[in-house]
Amino acid sequence: MNNNLSKLGLGGATFGNVLADGIFGGVNQEKAIEIINYAYESGIKIFDTAPLYGFGRSELWYGRALSGIKRGSINLTSKCGRLIRNVRNKNDSIISDIDIDKGYGEPVFDYSRDGIRRSVEESLARLKTDYLDTLLLHDPDQGGLESEAYQSAFPEMAKMKEEGIVKNVGCGMNECEMPIRFMKKIDLDKILLAGRYTLLENTKSSEFMKICAKKNVKV
């Protein structure tokens, strides 16, 4: 992985998503692809997404936008812990791209070893790539899944890192308390923290940042 790709990255949470209880309607496919292409042409080479974002649409649109770009020139991050299932047919084990585009995707937590691997395999297919630069475990605090994270999710992520399917592993969360516990027990490469860290509000995050520096975990 080339760590000198860019200092800034583009997040894909708004692509196909309805946020803030419907206050923000998200970004459609045409605009999302335009944004991704503009970001790349402007020098941004780090792209972040997740199955949750747009219930599969964010990954799908990233894959379409970046399909003609040399893979080694970009850094792709996605997340695991949720599978996207078809609201119209609960028996479908894999939802089609067509139904994702139509908005029929529904996220379901699954921290089992099989669920984590399937999540990654489905993300790779949507993103049109054979590896991820970074794989983050998504929202174990929201699902009350801390024990499952230790028992099955992180071990499977580590195995995929050994296999070369992912280059770095970590977690993506809103608060710093659980990542602090994670770092004290397991080896992580990166953490995406969506909470606030400013000059005025950093008391809770100070311990977190110190541990990251000590453990050489990128934030």
Question: What is each stretch, according to the model?
Answer:
Residues 1-86:
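N-terminal binding-site loop/beta-alpha segment at the start of enzyme catalytic domains
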Residues 5-9, 45-46, 73-77, 131-136, ...:
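Structural preference for beta-strand elements that scaffold enzyme active sites
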Residues 16-30, 101-117, 144-146:
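Active-site mouth loops of central-metabolism enzymes
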Residues 23-24, 87-99:
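Short, flexible, mixed-charge acidic loops at enzyme active sites
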